Regions:
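A short glycine-rich, Lys/Arg-flanked "PGG" loop and its adjoining helix->strand segment in the class I
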Residues: 150-165
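A short acidic, Gly/Pro-enriched loop at the edge of an enzyme's catalytic core
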Residues: 125-136
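N-terminal auxiliary segments of SAM/dcSAM-dependent transferases
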Residues: 1-25
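Short, glycine-/aromatic-enriched active-site segment of Class I SAM-dependent methyltransferases
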Residues: 172-195, 208
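Conserved alpha-helix/loop element of class I SAM-dependent methyltransferases that forms part
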Residues: 32-40, 44-65
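Short alpha-helix
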Residues: 196-212
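Class I SAM-dependent methyltransferase SAM/SAH-binding core
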Residues: 68-70, 74-126
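C-terminal lobe and adjacent flexible extensions of AdoMet/dcAdoMet transferase-like proteins
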Residues: 240, 254-289
C-alpha cells in the first residue's frame, strides 16, 4: 500500500475541525477521550469503555505514583488526567495542536490535577526532552500519525530511563500487499482520519527490537474494540448523506466529511481483516550503560 503524504498541518486541521464530531457522538465533553474504547465484562456502556481502555493500559504498563509519564499524542488530556487522578503521578502530554493543548490544560484545571498534568505543543518524532527523562511513554491511537514509526520508537528509547516502559494502543496492518479493492477501503479509512499509513505488527515489532527494546509483547484486542467500531459504522450511514448535503451548503467541510467516511470504512477494514487493533508493550533494559 502506497503511503500518502499528509502534512503535520493537515493532521492539526483534522483534529481541530472535527472536534465537533467527537463532542456529538464520542462523549468528548465528559470523557476527554478520542480513542476507540475497550469492551470487556466490566463495561456496561460506551463511556465506560473509554475509561476502561485507560485502565487496561495502566495495568499493562504498571503505572506507579513515582512515575514520570509522557502521553505522546495527548488529545484534550483524557488519559493524562486519568493517570494523574488515579495514581498521583506526574504526566506531560504533547500534541501537535495548540487548540488541544490549551483545552487539555483547562480540563486538567477543572479536574484539579493541573499540578500533576501539563501539556505542550510538540512533535513526538522530534521531541525536545533531554535523554532519559521519563519512566513511561504512553500512546493511544496517535503513533499511527507518525511519518516514520521507526523514528518515533528511536525517540521513545532515547527519552526513556533505564527500565522504562512503553505502551502503545493502535491499529496495525495485517499484511503489506493488498488488492486494489482493499487499498480503496484502507485509503478511505486512513486518509479521512489524517493517517499516512499503518505499519504491520511484524515491522513494528522489528523496529522495537532493533532499537534496543526488550520484553516486547503484542496483544490483539480487536474484538474488544469491535463494539465501538460498529457504533461508529452505524452513525456513519445516515451521517454520510447528511454530510454531503451540509457540505453542499457549506455547513460542513471536506475534512469533516472525510471523518465520517473514515468512520464508515474503518469497520469494513476490520471486518475484512485488513487491520487489527492491538497493544504493544516494551521495556528499555535496566542493564544498559
Amino acid at each position: 500500500m502506497a503511503a500518502k503524504k499528509i502534512s503535520k498541518k493537515e493532521i492539526i486541521h483534522y483534529y481541530d475541525s472535527t472536534e465537533v464530531d467527537y463532542k456529538l457522538i464520542w462523549d468528548l465533553n465528559k470523557s476527554y477521550a478520542m480513542h476507540f474504547g475497550y469492551w470487556d465484562k466490566k463495561v456496561k456502556n460506551f463511556p465506560q469503555s473509554l475509561q476502561r481502555e485507560n485502565e487496561i493500559l495502566a495495568e499493562k504498563v504498571k503505572i506507579k505514583n513515582s512515575d514520570i509519564v509522557l502521553d505522546a499524542g495527548c488529545g484534550v488530556g483524557g488519559s493524562a488526567i486519568f493517570l494523574a487522578k488515579k495514581f498521583g503521578c506526574k504526566v506531560i502530554g504533547i500534541t501537535l495542536s495548540k487548540r488541544q493543548a490549551d483545552k487539555a490544560t483547562n480540563n486538567a484545571k477543572q479536574k484539579g490535577v493541573a499540578h500533576l498534568a501539563e501539556f505542550r505543543v510538540m512533535d513526538f518524532e522530534k521531541m525536545t526532552f533531554p535523554d532519559k527523562a521519563f519512566d513511561v511513554i504512553w500512546a493511544i491511537e496517535s503513533i499511527c500519525h507518525a511519518d516514520s514509526k521507526k523514528r518515533f520508537i528511536e525517540e521513545a528509547y532515547r527519552i526513556l530511563r533505564k527500565g522504562g516502559r512503553l505502551v502503545i494502543a493502535d491499529a496495525f496492518l495485517t499484511k503489506e500487499n493488498v488488492t486494489a479493492d482493499e487499498e480503496i477501503i484502507l485509503n478511505k479509512f486512513l486518509f479521512g482520519w489524517g493517517v499516512n499509513y499503518l505499519e504491520t505488527v511484524k515491522n513494528f515489532n522489528k523496529y522495537l527490537r532493533t532499537t534496543g527494546f526488550r520484553t516486547i509483547t503484542f496483544t490483539d484486542v480487536t474484538n474488544n474494540v469491535m463494539p465501538s467500531s460498529k457504533r461508529l459504522y452505524r452513525f456513519s450511514i445516515p451521517a454520510m448523506y447528511i454530510g454531503k448535503f451540509a457540505e453542499f451548503f457549506k455547513m460542513r467541510t471536506k475534512t469533516q466529511n472525510g471523518n465520517i467516511i473514515a468512520a464508515h470504512y474503518q469497520h469494513k477494514a476490520l471486518v475484512r481483516g485488513l487491520g487489527k487493533y492491538g497493544i504493544f508493550y516494551a521495556e528499555k533494559s535496566s542493564a544498559i550503560s
